[in-house]
């Protein structure tokens, strides 16, 4: 899993470097349109130095126009690691010929071998096929046309909207069952599955956004709007149902996101994520602590909610508490006690209305 996380992080960094709207991508696109082909290496460490033969040391500031003009020469361009300077033009690269390569063309084969030998980012721009291929270590990624990525991103947004609706239905139903005191592990796991799918699609959309660069601003806005408060509420759901009382609910949600990236989760995986044995029956009754529901009461800060739960232990305990009992809790006066009672009643009514709409 750690290796996969590192791989994803590397890919994000690479895509951000060559995303539309960046000077480097502008220069690459110019070379692509001119159909001259090109080979660009980012980074000039000792390993790169050992495989560079010849070339002109120019050490000038990067500009898209400079890249375009210098790429007309047959050799490779060597840039610094951030792509802000062009160090060498028309360099011949001589990587180890014993390094395996799946590529057939000389330019792409050289690019793959240089990337594997040095770990540097290498960009190969095809002369005839209008394709940009990125290599770094064993990573190989072909940049897609912006129109194709936008179409996929919009499809993913539509899918996310559907799973958001599933989440809304599940969390509404769970809220009603919480007030009725009939929640089982099955309902909690069902809602967590919808969180899993939302997080999985979110990660896919983020990868499109990284690749779209400045073209992905609208997609990012849609994603932010769709996920508003969902992750915060999911973290409180975990805090409600984790077997032992925990303050690490955000870390547990992060772990769920990492697991969602690598595999489809079984019910037992989600049960274990909540701190229970994997063989726990889904029909087992569970009781919420009440963090999620009480957080919906207006003007009740988290510290007061923490005091409430510490005193009454569960949502049912808070709901059954009298005005005087609520008044006894630190930070709650008579006025706030009444607001809490009224707030809980309004939330319950809203949940019933939502289910029947």
Curated annotation (Swiss-Prot):
One of its GO terms (biological process) is DNA repair. Its EC number is 2.7.7.85. Keywords: ATP-binding, DNA damage, DNA repair, DNA-binding, Magnesium, Nucleotide-binding, Nucleotidyltransferase, Transferase. One of its GO terms (molecular function) is ATP binding. Its cofactor is Mg(2+). InterPro entries: DisA (IPR050338), DisA_sf (IPR038331), DNA_integrity_DisA_N_sf (IPR036888), DNA_integrity_scan_DisA_link (IPR018906), DNA_integrity_scan_DisA_N (IPR003390), DNA_integrity_scanning_protein (IPR023763), RuvA_2-like (IPR010994). Diadenylate cyclase activity is inhibited by the interaction with RadA. It comes from the Bacteria. The keyword Coiled coil does not apply. Residues 8-146 form the DAC domain. ATP binds at residues 75, 93, 106-110. It catalyses: 2 ATP = 3',3'-c-di-AMP + 2 diphosphate. It holds the Pfam family DAC. Belongs to the DisA family. Participates in a DNA-damage check-point that is active prior to asymmetric division when DNA is damaged. DisA forms globular foci that rapidly scan along the chromosomes during sporulation, searching for lesions. When a lesion is present, DisA pauses at the lesion site. This triggers a cellular response that culminates in a temporary block in sporulation initiation. Homooctamer. Interacts with RadA. This is DNA integrity scanning protein DisA. It comes from Bacillus thuringiensis (strain Al Hakam). The gene is disA.
């Amino acid at each position: 899993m750690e290796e996969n996380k590192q791989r994803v992080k590397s890919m994000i960094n690479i895509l951000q470097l060559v995303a539309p709207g960046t000077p480097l991508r502008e220069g690459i696109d110019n070379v692509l349109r001119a159909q001259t082909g090109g080979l660009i290496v980012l980074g000039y460490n000792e390993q790169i130095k050992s495989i560079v033969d010849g070339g002109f040391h120019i050490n000038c500031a990067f500009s898209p126009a400079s890249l375009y003009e210098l790429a007309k020469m047959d050799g490779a361009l060597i840039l610094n690691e951030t792509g802000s300077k062009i160090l060498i033009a028309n360099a011949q690269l001589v990587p180890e010929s014993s390094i395996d390569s799946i590529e057939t063309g000389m330019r792409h084969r050289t690019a793959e071998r240089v990337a594997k030998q040095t770990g540097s980012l290498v960009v190969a721009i095809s002369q005839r096929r209008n394709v940009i291929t990125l290599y770094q270590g064993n990573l190989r990624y072909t940049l897609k046309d912006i129109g194709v990525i936008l179409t996929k991103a919009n499809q993913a947004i539509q899918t996310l909207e559907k799973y958001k609706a599933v989440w809304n239905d599940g969390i509404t139903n769970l809220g009603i069952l919480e007030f009725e005191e009939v929640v089982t592990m099955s309902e909690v796991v069902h809602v967590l599955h919808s969180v899993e799918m939302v997080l999985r699609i979110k990660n896919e959309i983020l990868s499109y956004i990284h690749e779209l660069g400045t073209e992905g601003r609208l997609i990012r806005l849609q994603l932010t709007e769709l996920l508003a408060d969902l992750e915060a509420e999911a973290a409180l759901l975990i805090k409600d149902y984790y077997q032992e009382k925990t303050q690490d609910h955000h870390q547990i949600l992060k772990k769920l996101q990492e697991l969602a990236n690598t595999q489809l989760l079984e019910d037992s995986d989600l049960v274990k994520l909540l701190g229970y044995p994997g063989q726990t029956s889904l029909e087992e009754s569970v009781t919420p602590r009440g963090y999620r529901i009480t957080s919906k009461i207006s003007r009740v800060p988290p510290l007061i909610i923490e005091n409430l739960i510490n005193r009454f232990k569960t949502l049912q305990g808070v709901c059954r508490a009298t005005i005087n009992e609520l008044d006894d809790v630190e930070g709650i006066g008579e006025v706030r006690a009444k607001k809490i009672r009224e707030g809980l009643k309004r939330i319950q009514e809203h949940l019933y209305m939502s289910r029947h709409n």
